[in-house]
């Protein structure tokens, strides 16, 4: 609100990073950057970021991009943090897998009511994740366990890292 719509460009980063110490980060997976269209600088920003090798993509609908990022980050994030489990352990447990799928279904239902569509983000197949979450557990669970467990490069979800580091604020 302080900047107003003219001062903000919606965006998302799908790269995976690790914080080694204050001011010291390492890029674990270079996926890309999403920028919402609609701002006078959006096209130029995408071009500059892409020229810098950041695999930038323009998204015509900011809501689709932002909710798709939420959907991509949802699996095994809060559950892993609360229960101090890895994402693979969460998805290996039948009851927790069911809980995760119910959370995904709820997010997809909210998106549908608002006319928001899942969309793939840079090197992040969100539409496939949305599709897989609707498959029977015997088909989807082994695939999602591997994808969610390995999709973070062996790193725990950010919420888990923040919670167990005693941080009072999280992304």
Segments predicted by a language model, with ranges:
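Charge-dense, low-complexity intrinsically disordered segments
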Residues: 36, 90, 94, 98, ...
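Rossmann-fold dinucleotide-binding core
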Residues: 1-69, 74-75, 80, 84
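Generic recognition of short, well-ordered alpha-helical interface segments
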Residues: 40, 44, 69, 98-106, ...
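Active-site/ligand-binding neighborhood in enzyme catalytic cores
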Residues: 68, 72-87, 140-155
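A short alpha-helix capping/helix-coil boundary motif
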Residues: 23-27, 37, 57, 85-88, ...
């Amino acid at each position: 609100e302080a900047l107003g719509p003219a001062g903000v460009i919606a965006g998302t980063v799908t790269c995976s990073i690790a914080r080694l110490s204050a001011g010291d980060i390492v890029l674990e997976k270079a996926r890309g950057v999403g920028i919402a269209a609609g701002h006078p600088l959006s096209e130029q920003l995408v071009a500059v970021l892409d020229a810098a090798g950041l695999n930038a993509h323009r998204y015509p609908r900011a809501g689709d991009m932002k909710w798709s990022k939420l959907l991509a980050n949802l699996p095994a994030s809060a559950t892993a943090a609360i229960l101090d489990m890895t994402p693979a352990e969460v998805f290996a447990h039948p009851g927790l897998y069911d809980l995760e799928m119910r959370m995904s279904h709820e997010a997809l239902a909210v998106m549908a009511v608002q006319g928001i569509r899942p969309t793939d983000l840079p090197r992040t197949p969100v539409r496939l994740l949305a599709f897989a979450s609707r498959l029977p557990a015997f088909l989807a669970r082994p695939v999602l366990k591997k994808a969610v467990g390995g999709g973070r490069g062996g790193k725990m979800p950010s919420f888990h890292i923040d919670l167990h580091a005693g941080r009072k604020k999280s992304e």
